[in-house]
Amino acid sequence: MRMFIFFCNFAGDMGHVYHIPEQKEKETTVFYTTILKNMKVLVATEKPFAKVAVDGIKQVVEQAGYELVLLEKYTQKQQILEAVADVDALIIRSDNVDAEVLDAAKQLKIVVRAGAGYDNIDLAAATAHKVVAMNTPGQNSNAVAELALGMMVMAVRNLYNGTSGTELKGKKLGIHAYGNVGRNVARIAKGFGMEIYAYDAYCPDEVMLAEGVTPLHSAAELYAACNIVSLHIPATPETKASINKALLSQMPKGAVLVNTARKEVIHEDELIQFMQERQDFRYVTDVMPAADQKMRELFEERYFATPKKMGAQTAEANINAGIAAAKQIVDFLVNGNTKFQVNK
């Protein structure tokens, strides 16, 4: 008997292929379509998307025949626990999706972080719950890169106090992690006439060289060579607190560290100790340290942090990441595409 191959995304056994007798093909296809059409996609955002981004997400979701549910500006965890109870897909920004949230999401199949970083998702718990976790790499990389360059200008021109500063032209810029953001930083920095170096253990030298960037082969080598380092590493068990006094001590006089990555990668106690010893060093970031108040008091004219994460806070990045998240959800539910999956 000829068999009908049926790819099942909705049953929680993603990736399995089911064989259904020929005479069942028509009724099964109808059943499958009905299930897909009844799916719910929740957008849960403490910091909401721009309205134009929500409109774009809604269009993608509803064109696929799904229902869009919004939970915006929520203030209590209980609100998201209740909202995820009956949804099939979840879009978040910096919102935390931990084991408790996943426990409450009884029929959740996929969660997408609209942005590059995904340390706000408990990946092990997602895997345990058979939930696919994704990010949307590259969608906000230009926004983050532009902010990083703006922070460099702020630091070297002494906008803290309005005194005379220096120019970026001719300075040695080190890019720590040469991914989507790092590559955009390099592209923009070329326009300033900077000498550009990069260290990324996972990026071939040939890629950097083809883009006019000099590859270096250790973080210590990068920090020792450069006047300014732009930090773009993710927060992982290997990188947390890895930017420490020993590494920073390699940097030349008048050095600047720009962090638009994650605060967890900085060893805060050692950063403070280093800045107390090195009066020439400046630190600029869009991820406020836990010791922000202390650092403001100690280093008023050498330290700046934005009140909240600002790298992706542009209208363009907002729209790009939100719509990309919606498209990835539809592609996953319909076609089983796991291209941007970050858990195993």
Regions found by a protein language model. Give the residues of each.
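Rossmann-like adenosine-cofactor binding region
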Residues: 99-102, 203-297, 313
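Structural motif
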Residues: 44-48, 72, 94, 260, ...
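C-terminal helix-to-coil terminal segments
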Residues: 31-40, 45, 52-56, 63, ...
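Phosphate-binding beta-alpha-beta segment of Rossmann-like dinucleotide-binding domains, i.e.
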Residues: 129-191, 206, 332, 337-343
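Phosphate-coordination loops involved in phosphoryl transfer and adenosine-cofactor binding
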Residues: 38, 108, 169-172, 245, ...
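NAD(P)-binding Rossmann-fold cofactor-contacting core
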Residues: 191-209
